[in-house]
């Protein structure tokens, strides 16, 4: 009986402490403009537009300004829009805004020991490990893998060009980016045939996990309920377990291959030189007890999720935009072909990144119109602060409104038109594709190399056309990344 009383008292105490903390945050944030909420704040309104959440935030930005407040259940949220505001928060006041907002349902998955949702010194150590493999020198070494994957993709597209029938490209572009990250992590890649074999391969599992991980969670919006319920679906945990098992097998395979490589002094998987991946340094962290084996699995999953869907979706949107703007596609193709030296059959990012000016402009415009992380990853204020005269309470969730920063007339003329020439002035401060601050995208150098290389190979070698008279749909939907609708194109080889 005493135990029951103790449990009851503890629960009541937790409840009142939570309510008191929420009241404090609401009181401090109350002067910030934003949509009025009734039952459950703005949760119901947001739930109705969940696939177009970015459009709702654009609407609210136009109405309430660059700093506005949203109540999502019991979750106090402030949304920041525009580079000047984002800079003030995430650069000028970085100590206050650096922390990642930690969703309650992530605790049961990795105890906040992954790459995405960790904080403090633990995250700083992980970041230093990851960034040590993202230097210009390391990215240059990755070029051969990116070029190899681009070649495999072009060989596949050659088959479709010969057939001359419309087909959907999304899945191929997603696997292109998945394979590069798998090579980056584990030194492996997978054939494009695995997209259609209906198996439970890692490719299939990653794609299923991407769909499930973005599903809404009750405990995110009502954290007080987390001790009493686990609102992740059984399917989510089953897929997460499958993905974890694939990661474990890849890690063991990599360790065995590395051992064999050291014994035989041969490269892994037939590479021309010894393969070094980020996994080597992460394994050292495990050996030194700075991260656990379970954390290693979570970190690998985070890198996969962060690096695959984003690039794949970006390339899909790039093709859609250039099919809908045929004259821009032709200009880009000519610029690529004319800029490459005679005898160069394939694009080299380190050689041509500054040598094909129109390609650079087109990539910037793709990043602007179709930012992968449309609302970024949520942050949390570590103390009370003030931005543009608005007081924001400690513990408030902070959203970087990247989509509105890129798609509002407040920052760009004709924001919904695809105009690469707008970037000739090179005002990069307006673009926040990779987020702002010390926790911006760690893989942006690799992503840029992937996107530049893929677009140079695709548009330098193929002409993409729309088999329909209706323009391709470029209205993305909200998910882990801005999702491009499936689209059909016809392609033909350029001479």
Swiss-Prot record:
Segments crossing the lipid bilayer: 1-21
CDD domains named in the record: CYP1_2-like
Entry's Gene Ontology cellular component terms: membrane
Entry superkingdom: Eukaryota
Presence of keyword Electron transport: no
Cofactor: heme
The protein's name in its UniProt record: Probable cytochrome P450 513C1
